[in-house]
Curated annotation (Swiss-Prot):
PANTHER family: FLIPPASE KINASE 1-RELATED. Keywords: ATP-binding, Auxin signaling pathway, Cell membrane, Kinase, Membrane, Nucleotide-binding, Serine/threonine-protein kinase, Transferase. This is Serine/threonine-protein kinase D6PKL3. Its EC number is 2.7.11.1. It comes from Arabidopsis thaliana.
């Protein structure tokens, strides 16, 4: 055994201990009994590799490093540049955000090239978090990607009766869903680029909402891009308060989107049924909280909604909401950042103060330890501690959790879109607008739910636009609404977008407002809704559609083909400058 060999102990038995001796070109196994006698010598020769020139070695090393660059180095590079995400015990949004980034990262590693999601490219070096399928994995149509749908749709419930019905029909017909598989029952409503019908998937008894867009009409109005944008956005969504695109198909004349049917109608109709035609504050808080989470998710994806109003907030069969109608939405880039806040030292001699500028009522200032950053903080519990032992500095500090901010603040559009009473001042002025318009409309939305009217409505559309730009915000004397609700509305309806609540920090800032103090964000889906809609019997509805999609021409089975109203309604307006 030469000097270059090494001996390794590999185990023992009842009568001996076993060793291996490794040297250049061979491995020798042997054992030593209790008397110290070496025996059972076995030698395994290892063949020498053929000599390789330095040039070949260098070439092969560079080749291997280039190949290994793909999955591992991308992850390492991203981890160096991406913020870390921490979950909050009271907010599942951060866990969902982390899952969103994980899915995006996985999709990048899977194909080693830029992956398009609904026509949007994911940037390798930036942090763009469009989350969704490659192709049409959210519909019933097969995807060309080999990746699992579940990797992109964690909220998809395969036990959902709608998915079960679709799979049942697909297995029976052996193809994707088509127009002939649906029987249209009644018209539910109409939008700017199409009409929505209640439809039954034939042979299953399961109802869907089918949006039918007439190709010729939307092409004549130059709305094809709007229709395509809506479909791509729907394909990318995966959130409890946003719609699922179950299928999409085309006929000769129509383009159709198959979504969930919400039997509770919309919040506008539901508000009209309330006593006084406004919601109690507790009910309004429930609805706007769920809308806020949906908007937060959209902004994380770089989607500015731009059309929030009660008519577009639908009520599901369980009483929770679903945001609908994305044909006016704007897609843009977003760069999420993780902000860490310094620890806040509590001084017993300090007086009450508020961190948020919109909160001016000291009686509403309380400690919110479950928030990421205290909104309004009063160290009143320290004033009772005269007989307490003096604690150290560490115990007298609040250390806020890191805060994820994913607000697309850099987005700019010159489009003049929306409903007159909900238009933000910067849209009317033509100054260009970004994500802050959604928080203006959120303020109008909350105002209407609480008071039954919008704050700037005039005698006609021209007067309404003038009021939005030039008139101050006023509140009616009745009904009686809490200070926190009025304070939140004041913060949202600031005419200068850069001073508007949530302009920088987005929905996180709104969620920390005292108006939402009683909301448990982590368990909001378990909260009992203010009202559960009555079960709907679709076949008993009046004004039903006669048959279904007629074969051949692709018309809806109505007395005449459905047409998209070429003239916008009186409250709706859209002008694209570029």
């Amino acid at each position: 055994m030469d000097s270059s060999s090494s001996v390794v102990y590999v185990g023992s038995s009842s009568k001996s201990r076993n060793f291996q001796s490794k040297s250049k070109g061979s491995i020798t196994s042997f054992s030593i009994d209790s008397r110290g006698t070496k025996k059972s010598m076995k030698t395994l020769l290892i063949p020498e590799p053929e000599p390789t020139s330095p040039e070949v070695i260098e070439s092969s090393v560079s080749s291997v490093s280039a190949e290994s660059e793909t999955p591992i180095s991308i992850i390492r590079k991203k981890k160096q540049s991406e913020p870390r995400f921490y979950s909050s015990p009271t907010n599942t949004f951060y866990t969902e955000a982390k899952q969103s980034f994980t899915n995006t990262e996985f999709s990048e590693c899977a194909s080693i090239s830029t992956i398009g999601i609904g026509g949007i490219d994911l940037e390798k070096n930036g942090v763009m978090i469009y989350r969704g399928s490659i192709g049409s994995d959210v519909s019933d149509e097969s995807s060309s990607s080999g990746l699992s749908n579940a990797a992109y749709k964690p909220h998809r419930d395969n036990n959902d009766k709608r998915w079960v019905a679709i799979q049942e029909v697909r297995s029976r017909v052996g193809s994707s869903l088509e127009a002939k598989d649906f029987k249209l029952i009644k018209k539910l409503g109409g939008g700017d680029i199409g009409n929505v019908y209640l439809a039954e998937l034939i042979g299953t008894g399961v109802s869907f909402a089918v949006k039918v867009m007439e190709k010729a009409a939307i092409a004549a109005r130059k709305k094809l891009v709007r229709a395509q944008t809506e479909k791509e956005i729907l394909q990318s969504l995966d959130h409890p308060f946003l719609p699922t695109l179950y299928s999409h198909f085309e006929t000769e004349m129509n383009s159709c989107l198959v979504m969930e049917f919400c039997p509770g109608g919309d919040l506008h109709s539901l508000r009209q049924k309330q006593r006084g035609k406004y919601f109690p504050e507790q009910a309004a808080r429930f609805y706007v909280a769920e809308v806020l989470l949906a908007m937060e998710y959209l902004h994380m994806l770089g989607i500015i909604y731009r059309d929030l109003k009660p008519e577009n907030v639908l009520v599901r069969e369980d009483g929770h909401i679903m945001l609908s109608d994305f044909d006016l939405s704007l897609r843009c880039a977003v760069s999420p950042t993780l902000v860490r806040f310094a620890a806040i030292t509590l001084e017993s001699k300090s007086s009450s103060y508020c961190i948020q500028p919109t909160c001016v009522d000291q009686s509403s200032c309380i400690v919110q330890p479950d928030c990421i950053q205290p909104v309004c903080f009063t160290p009143r519990f320290l004033s009772k501690g005269k007989h307490r032992k003096k604690s150290n500095d560490m115990s007298r500090q609040i250390r806020p959790l890191p805060e994820l901010i994913a607000e697309p603040t850099s987005a700019r559009s010159m489009s003049f879109v929306g409903t007159h009473e909900y238009l933000a001042p910067e849209i009317i002025k033509g100054e260009g607008h970004g994500s802050a318009v959604d928080w203006w409309t959120f303020g109008i939305f909350l105002y209407e739910l609480l008071f039954g009217i919008t704050p700037f409505r005039g005698g006609d559309n021209r007067a309404t636009l003038f009021n939005v730009v030039g008139q101050p915000l006023r509140f009616p004397e009745h009904p009686n609404v809490s200070f926190a609700a009025r304070d939140l509305i004041r913060g949202l309806l600031v005419k200068e977008p850069q001073h508007r609540l949530a302009y920088r920090r987005g929905a996180t800032e709104i969620k920390q407002h005292p108006f939402f103090q009683s909301v448990n964000w982590a368990l909001i889906r378990c909260t009992s809704p203010p009202q559960i809609p009555q079960p709907v019997k679709p076949m008993d509805q009046a004004h039903s559609v006669r048959h279904g999609f007629s074969q051949g021409h692709g018309h809806v089975g109505y007395d005449k083909p459905p047409t998209v109203d070429v003239k916008p309604s009186g409250n709706y307006l859209e002008i694209d400058f570029f």
